[in-house]
Amino acid sequence: MNVLIIGSGGREHTFCWKLAQSEVCDHLFVAPGNAGTSRLATNLPIAVNDFKKLKKEVLFHNINLVVVGPEDPLVNGIHDFFLNDPDLAHVAVVGPQKQAAQLEGSKDFAKEFMIRHGIPTAKYATFTPKTLAEGYAYLENQIPPYVLKADGLAAGKGVLIIEDLQEAKKELKKMLIEGSFGEASKQVVIEEFLDGIELSCFILTDGDGHLVLPMAKDYKRIGEGDQGPNTGGMGAVSPVSFVTPVFEKKIKDKIIEPTLEGFKKDNIPYQGFLFIGLIKVGEEPKVIEYNVRMGDPETQVVLPLLLNDLGVLLSAVANKTLKEEKIDFAKKAAVTVVAVSGGYPADYEKGKVIEGLCTDSKENI
């Protein structure tokens, strides 16, 4: 089969690397891709949200399967675009439809889903510009630190954790009235602060069967010793040392199963990867957020541990035969470290040449 991967990051490079090893993948394309993917596949210079141009290339290259890396095209309805176009109806898309993608596209939607299905998460309330005064009153009744989250997509920057009440009120006003995060902060979710250690859980589902991938933990802060501002992720490890068999069973029983059952009860079709951001509070798991795709940089430590042919698993998703597959992964550890330009995550230079890479490196550099 011919496969198109949509995206341009390290996550998509890892998908490309893994699918290049697949016995069922004939030709591999990435849109728009990057310098790394160009070594393994054909890059197509198309933006991830340019659905019409993507359609043209899918038909021209006789692509059978599309794997969506980032969240933007999913929230914008790329799966629905393929599903509703007679020319593309035969092309399978690994990634949920627009309705399900709201689990990441709207934090309020996700929180309502969790509460409705008894999935453990932080207490919360949602506010709009019209209910700013109620938002102030809600903050006054909370114990600091105060957690403010832009409802929509904000490129991973829409979460503020603030110690001071007056500062929290000021930021709430900025978000709701001044639009400090643009459209994303037209609604703001204020959450109870959860004190614990975070981890990431990954599921692949065809809407009926599902497989649980190795769990991972990413490290977001820019500086040594977990200091400095948050980033998209400076590194990740898998497996996670503090996930015991007992704790893993709690995740499956209290979070994974109720989530998948919730999709069925709410009549939400879900096909693709589901990334559940968790926090371990004491000995209990709670959900911080849902993401409707694989994580970056977590993909870079999860897929190298996977012993299965990824192409076979994704074909099973397309054919809704995932129940027939069993997952197998190496009993080893994987670590990834992210190299970034100076100044990141603020203003930084782009387009610099990366030198000194070993193409035959056993460490996958």
Where do the model's predicted regions map?
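Active-site "cap" helix and flanking loop/linker of ATP-utilizing ligase/carboxylase catalytic domains
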Residues: 251-274, 291-364
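Active-site nucleotide/adenylate-binding loops and adjacent lid/helix of ATP-dependent enzymes
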Residues: 4-5, 90, 103-187, 241-257
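Internal nucleotide-binding/catalytic subdomain
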Residues: 158-299
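Short, charged, surface-exposed secondary-structure boundary motifs
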Residues: 38-40, 102-107, 223-224
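General beta-strand structural signal in soluble alpha/beta enzymes
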Residues: 5, 30-31, 67-68, 93-96, ...
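ATP-binding N-terminal substructure of ATP-dependent carboxylate-amine bond-forming enzymes
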Residues: 1-96
